[in-house]
Amino acid sequence: MPAVTTPPSNSSTSPHKEAIRKLHDELAPERNRWLRKAAFFHSEDLLYLKFLIPAGSRILELGCGTGHLLAALKPSQGVGVDISSGMIEQARQTYPDLTFLQGDIEDPTFINSLSGPFDVILIMDTLGVLSDCQQTFTNLHQLCARETRLIVVYFSHLWKPILKLAELVRLRKPQPPQNVFSPQDVHDLVALADFEAVKAELRILSPLWLLGIGRFLNRFIAPAPGIRSLCLRHYTVCRSLLNKDDGIHSATVVVPARNERGNIEQAVLRIPQFCDDIEIIFVEGHSRDGTWEEIQRVMSVYPQRNIKAMRQPGKGKADAVFAAFDVAQGDVLMILDADLTMPPEHLPKFWEAIRSGKGEYINGSRLIYQMEDEAMQFLNLIANKLFSIIFTWLLSQRFTDTLCGTKVLRRSDYEKLKAGRKYFGDFDPFGDFDIIFGASKLGLKVVEIPIRYAKRTYGETQISRFRHGILLLRMVAFAFFRIKAL
């Protein structure tokens, strides 16, 4: 990792910091009472943070207060830091299994004393009192690995008058003078500190229960385009750009094949040697045209290629792909559909995008370049473009083509995706959305690579337009209730 310059800081002795420390020491005995007063708001906050942060993660919370949030996230290793000794004392008494440290998070010497890396670094309502946000972010790189997510949570500047009124009527605990940030300000600050915002979400339209109306508003009304910009809370998920390369060297290309006999040899001949160690796994799906026999023949003709073959245990593309992923040896996992409508010659672009750290989940897109005549029917094209807009909104990450078969991610990230699959369940027979939704939930950096979609030269398509459309409608409803409307 490149060296990070950390100039000395004397912010912990500034009058501003002393005022913050004193205020929070005074508020510490009453902290739990204030939490109970705003119990609904804090439960809404926690709901989304639990979605972002899997239980069992290694979590560092900067500005932890009395530790209630850190404990609720159920970390395997939890470290909380706060400038207030009063808050830290209460946290230690209440949650003895977690680690709580009193310190100034703007002090590079203190940050240097922490032992990382962590899976998640959480900065919750702390930006507003920092003297130098950019330098604070910069100091955190040494606590990050490639997979670490920095999550920054803050109040919308649009709500400042309402929050001030809540203080005056004693619905919110007293606050020190606050910096006020727009979403663009936060994105610029993390970028200046060599972090990259990979996902941004707005939530909570009502901080009050209102006899259940608040829950309805937050779940179903707050996500709506236009309304969303009025929400109280901003959540920005970032990754370190100084730790984006973790040394990948090998790849597995998984080729699910059902009734694709005429494409098997061409797949082997056309997959370039884009890295030193390429494993090709054909997964045969109960074909009727001799595909399995052709795979065996091709393996014997090209012994110099590392080709493996397996018959899928169940049915459907998802079953085939995940069966191969479970036995794959490569650092990077790639899906190449056996119809070769995504030209295998494009695979080096996908490899370079993930090897260089430009992306962590690489998705092909058929809908940017002109495609060959008859490669996709007009109604399919219109539907795909419409659904790409919907899924971009649902996932808060840009997608132009969710059903391109070529998808690439690290094997280590697939293992995390697999471990968290119980959240979504067995819902997708094709596997496209299983991977996309899992990557989005993990906060992976998504990069799309345009490909020139070619028409099929052998066999027939495995899916009808009607089934294709029904699948997309099902996935929209599923994503809304499992990702957007929590």
Stretches found by the model and what they are:
Residues 134-146:
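A short glycine-rich, Lys/Arg-flanked "PGG" loop and its adjoining helix->strand segment in the class I
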Residues 65-107:
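Class I SAM-dependent methyltransferase SAM/SAH-binding core
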Residues 284-293:
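A conserved acidic beta->alpha catalytic loop
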Residues 5-55, 211, 221-222:
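Conserved class I S-adenosyl-L-methionine
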Residues 159-174, 179, 310-327, 344-425, ...:
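Acceptor/aglycone-binding surface of glycosyltransferases and processive sugar-polymer synthases
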Residues 101-103, 292-327:
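Conserved donor nucleotide-binding strand/loop of the catalytic core
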Residues 2-10, 218-251, 255, 260-262, ...:
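Hydrophobic helical membrane-anchoring modules
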Residues 333:
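Short aromatic/hydrophobic "clamp" motif used to bind/position activated sugar donors
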